[in-house]
């Protein structure tokens, strides 16, 4: 309701994609809008992949955002070097949310447990994920959810993981030019097939020097622009002027 705009001094968004959506949908006054992006901690980088080594993929997103698509893709992946670790659960939002919602995804978790190239691990705190990220080579997120940003993508990019995701929502802004983007498809079976092909293709080039340089540049980019010193400074400058 545009008549309520005078009640607010500022609207702060975590991506330009989100700002544009709200501006167009609700007629927000642009002079009251600001984008300050999410920040991440320093993360230990993965070592460059050597050809012939096991290829470990991480997926640490909530189950309704694309896990079914990823499990469908893993059924089609034939490279014996590839395994996927799934840290997906409703527990990330607390016990009450877990108790009310996690049962809806029991069959999906069971499917993950039965696949030979998938390890279903379930919930682990973010501190565990970040401290173990250097053990992985790739991050796969076939998002069917319009993200306003994506901290898990940023963390994996900072950690030097080759990332594959869709171009839905603000993911293309968050990832910039670094991930492999799979065009979103409402046909989720077809999206699974595309993701399987992307995983196989990515696995075949992980050892190449150009990919190693790409991931080094990627990590430096994220650490330069999404570190908490930079983001914190943006908040401090904004709040100093706003207050």
Residue ranges and their predicted role:
Residues 17-18, 35-45, 90-93:
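Short beta-strand->alpha-helix junction loop in the catalytic core
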Residues 1, 7-33, 40:
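A short, active-site helix/loop in glycosyltransferases that binds the activated sugar's phosphate group
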Residues 98-124:
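Nucleotide-activated donor-binding/catalytic signature segment of Leloir-type glycosyltransferases, i.e.
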Residues 186, 207-240:
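A charged, aromatic-enriched C-terminal amphipathic alpha-helix characteristic of glycosyltransferases
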Residues 162-165, 172:
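Short hydrophobic beta-strand element within catalytic cores of glycosyltransferases
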Residues 134-148, 161:
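Acidic donor-binding loop of glycosyltransferase active sites
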Residues 12, 49-66, 71-75, 85:
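Conserved donor-binding/catalytic core segment of Leloir-type glycosyltransferases
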């Amino acid at each position: 309701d545009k008549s309520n705009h005078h009640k607010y001094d500022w609207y702060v968004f975590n991506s330009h994609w989100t700002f544009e959506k709200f501006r167009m949908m609700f007629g927000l006054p642009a002079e009251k809008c600001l984008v300050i992006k999410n920040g991440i901690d320093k993360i230990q980088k993965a070592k460059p992949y050597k050809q012939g080594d096991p290829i470990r993929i991480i997926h640490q997103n909530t189950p309704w955002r694309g896990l079914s698509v990823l499990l469908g893709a893993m059924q089609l992946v034939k490279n014996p070097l590839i395994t996927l670790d799934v840290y997906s659960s409703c527990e990330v939002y607390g016990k009450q949310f877990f108790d009310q919602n996690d049962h809806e995804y029991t069959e999906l978790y069971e499917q993950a447990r039965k696949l030979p190239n998938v390890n279903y691990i379930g919930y682990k705190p973010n501190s565990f994920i970040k401290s173990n990220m250097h053990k992985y080579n790739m991050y796969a997120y076939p998002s069917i959810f319009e993200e306003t940003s994506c901290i898990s993508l940023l963390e994996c990019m900072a950690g030097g993981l080759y990332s594959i995701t869709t171009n839905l929502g603000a993911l293309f802004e968050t990832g910039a030019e670094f991930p492999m983007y799979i065009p979103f498809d409402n046909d989720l079976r077809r999206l699974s097939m595309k993701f399987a092909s992307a995983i196989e293709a990515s696995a075949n080039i992980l050892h190449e020097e150009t990919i190693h340089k790409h991931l080094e540049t990627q990590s430096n980019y994220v650490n330069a622009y999404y570190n908490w010193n930079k983001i914190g400074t943006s908040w401090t400058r904004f709040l100093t002027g706003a207050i």
